[in-house]
């Protein structure tokens, strides 16, 4: 199960980095890559608090980089011709 979580996180990071604008990608790809340490804490069913490594990696990510990455994640369903995800429902 842990291997599947790590693989899913790695795939997501690679996909996100490919969608970032070139300049932003060059500036934040390493920081986003460091967030791989947070993989076990961002998937449904995870338990416990994030590790110190995860928190340090998150602290190091530029706010603009993090927001752009979240926007890209939010746009994925549209780019895949899928209905939008409504997390409030």
Curated annotation (Swiss-Prot):
The keyword Signal applies. Pfam families: Tryp_alpha_amyl (PF00234). Residues 1-25 form the signal peptide. Tapetum of anthers. Belongs to the A9/FIL1 family. It is found in: Secreted. This is Protein M7. InterPro entries: Bifun_inhib/LTP/seed_sf, Bifunc_inhib/LTP/seed_store. GO terms for cellular component: extracellular region. Keywords: Disulfide bond, Secreted, Signal. Disulfide bonds join 28-65, 38-54, 55-80, 67-87.
């Amino acid at each position: 199960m842990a291997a599947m979580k790590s693989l899913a996180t790695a795939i997501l990071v690679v996909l996100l980095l490919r969608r970032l604008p070139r300049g932003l990608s060059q500036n934040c790809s390493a920081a986003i890559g460091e967030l791989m340490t947070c993989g076990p804490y961002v998937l449904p069913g995870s338990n416990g608090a994030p590790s110190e490594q995860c928190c340090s990696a998150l602290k190091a990510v530029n706010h603009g980089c993090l927001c752009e990455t979240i926007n890209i994640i939010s746009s994925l369903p549209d780019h895949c011709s899928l209905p939008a995800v409504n997390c409030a429902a």
